């Protein structure tokens, strides 16, 4: 007989949906260990603006893959998959269940389905692309991508030089488009995965929570935290860390764009848009059980029932 696959739990959801609170309750009741699935929580020194679990919450439920990088560093879906698999193996070896909690859907997808065989970065080709962009502009580079790979060009904005450069680089290295290569599946996740998404039933409730969270962040010192990053000489607005919602709007404010109140308003709007994209992605997700964030007891019961099924 084949050995049964180890269990794993995905706890997904839009920002401000109550994922952390539910994860803490789950850890009290089940033999689980938490792994963060969040492209912002990986950064050190970015605590308030990312709504990182506080010291008390981390004491109740330690999260792996939090505070692992400096904001100068980049972190890909491939990096996450590698690190998450290592942490999952370690948790299973302890006789526990990995509980992956967060809202970065691309990370979940990479972990669940594996990654396409994309070529490694090539510094020479990347430098050549950047030189062309300096000469002709990123709009012209985007037009070039439209000719080569219209599907990727539709998804990638001309003002996103990192992703635009990568799409062109992939084609120049491999002779295949990013669209072609991403259709090739990688290794599937060797776990029995139970997938849940938590959200309030009403969209207005998400909006209310986002506004409340932003108000709390400002009271806790988000402006000072963001300014400390801005005053570093090794950070700039195009880094993935600084493109995180909230930080980007504060950065623009420090650059002289509008008032602090306007920056906060833009941050709230950007966070709402993020939540909307997360919900749209989750609605297309297969084999997903939805949980009501206003009924934690009911959510715990649903999770318990599903875990005991197999």
Curated annotation (Swiss-Prot):
Catalyzes the transfer of a dimethylallyl group onto the adenine at position 37 in tRNAs that read codons beginning with uridine, leading to the formation of N6-(dimethylallyl)adenosine (i(6)A). It holds the Pfam family IPPT. PANTHER family: TRNA DIMETHYLALLYLTRANSFERASE (PTHR11088:SF60). It catalyses: adenosine(37) in tRNA + dimethylallyl diphosphate = N(6)-dimethylallyladenosine(37) in tRNA + diphosphate. Monomer. The record marks 104, 126 as: Interaction with substrate tRNA. Keywords: ATP-binding, Magnesium, Nucleotide-binding, Transferase, tRNA processing. Its cofactor is Mg(2+). This is tRNA dimethylallyltransferase. It is an enzyme of class 2 (transferase).
